[in-house]
Amino acid sequence: MDLQRTNQDTGTTTLFKVVISNTVNYLPKGVWILRNNTIDSLSIAKQFREIKNNINISHLSRENYWVETPFGKVFHSEVVSEEFMQIFIDKGNKALNNEEMIFACMSEKGWNVSLETVPNLDIPVGSYETQLGLPVGLHPKLHVHLKNLHKPEDECSLQGFMYIPPTLFIDRYELSNIAEMHADNLGHVLGIWGETDLEAPSYKLNGTGSFFWFDIYTDDGLLQKDYIDTIIPLHTRYQSPLKGQTYLKTSLTNPKFFWNCDTEDKVNDFRFLFSSKNKYTLQNDPTTLSISIPIADLSYKHVVEWVTNGVAIFSFFYLLLYLWKRFRYAKD
């Protein structure tokens, strides 16, 4: 589907996509909605309610659960209910398999729904593997091994897009410095949107997470080697204490890597990720990585309070005693 033509013909104000497979798309698996900044979230939620009652996409109608980008506001949910998908499958009048995705446009005239199939490419464009560097610790490093790389067209650039869950964050300043030096083969940082506060704990945020879009540095020498390795540094956020637990497991979905061969618009527009053009997507297993984040155990809350207060009181009287002795010796 030609994205620009669709917008022009139907007056579309909202783009909507459900990705059920992590192997054939620019976007990771989940519900993705992109809307114009002039539309409010309540209007979007109303449109979904009119399709069928009791559609439960958490936080859809709340403005602070939409991530603002220069190209519009984005809603993302990793959870896709079967009921939610079935509505749009019915509107597309076709069964959906694992190599397809739902693509829908909402305009004043209603919904225009289609089911997209990404064709098998005659040109092998590459694949990739990911793993977390050991030890994982509080500052995990995502190691990416891109291999069997073949640039489909001369003007194509190798790009990656990933969703960062609210339990983790990336440091835009750290990444900018890495990209400036082309360290770890990281090229330009095309965009970081969402919850990017470097100090805020998870319980102080809305829980939308963040999106990271970036270039991989390539040259003829690297492509001749047939593989490129890169490292994406991540950081864990402070979590709320839980009773009986000392670790909180969080999931990190694999990033998506693809060749961006869109020469019509040199501006890296988020809407490109919703289009069906140039599906030169690198293949990988749709695995999810697990990270264990240390947290405080509420079972020991009272013990910690008593010990902390005891140390503070002891330190206070120790300092008083020390000062009194100094004063006494000075007087003598």
Swiss-Prot record:
Record topological domains on the Cytoplasmic side: 325-332
Superkingdom of the organism of origin: Eukaryota
Name of the protein this chain belongs to: Protein pbn1
Family: Belongs to the PIGX family.
Record's bilayer topology term: Single-pass type III membrane protein
GO biological process annotation, one example: cell wall organization
Positions glycosylated per UniProt: N36, N56, N112, N206
An annotated GO cellular component: glycosylphosphatidylinositol-mannosyltransferase I complex
